[in-house]
Every structure is written in C-alpha cells, then in structure tokens.
Amino acid sequence: MKVRLLGCGTSTGVPRVGNDWGLCDPAEPKNRRSRVSILVENSAGARLLVDTSPDLRNQLLDGGIDRIDAVFWTHDHADHVHGIDDLRVLRYGRAAPIPGYAADETARRLRLRFGYAFAGHDDYPTILSLEPLEPLRMCEIGRAHV
C-alpha cells in the first residue's frame, strides 16, 4: 500500500495569503505546503482520495494523477471539500459517478453545498455518488477494504 500526502499544510496553506510564513522558514522549500489531501493506493492499484482540498487541481497535476476510484471526506470544512469541482474531469470516461464516502452529517452538508455534483444537470453528468458508511465497520471503497 502506498500513501501519498498531496498536501499537508494548515487550513490556509503555507505561506498564507500576504506571504505570511508564520513560524516556518521561507528559505526551506519544503515549508511551502498546500492544504490537505491524501491519495491511498493498494497493491491492486485501487486509488482512494482522502479529502478534496481547494488546492486539489494543482495536487493532481503535480502528482500526475489522472484516475481515482473513490473519495472519502473526513469532515466538511472548506479546506477539506472545496476542491470537489476538480473531480469533474476525473469523472469523464467513467461509466458511473465516482463513489464518495462520508459520515452522515458530512454527507448531508456536502449535498447541501454541492448538490449539482451529486445530481448532475443540463450538459454535466453526475460527478459523484454518496455511499452510506457505518461507523466502525469495514467496507469496500473502490477495490480497497477500509
């Protein structure tokens, strides 16, 4: 199994807008960090994306990632979900929407804020489906057991 941190910065990223580095040394290139998203890939090649940060487009491009099998959202804060629109291009060429997983309250809030992504409209296909999760129970996401 491979776990790739696509972003590991704070909710504002590092540096913050205004070139505020906080306690981070701007001379250290590793201190320039985008917001949190994680890609987990199992030995069968199934890819699970954890969270969709606002920096997701650049993270996918930088990582050469052109396919995911499922998405899991840890919670609905903006720094973990506002990259959801960048999943649209990953939906193209798929027979079905990308499966998405979240706790009940997070799923409810995602539907409220990004209803178009789960329902589709006009010329846009449905991007994502929201699948139920049972707390503390194993489930299959993509081709991975989590």
Where are these regions (language model features)?
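Binuclear metal-dependent hydrolase catalytic cores
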Residues: 1-145
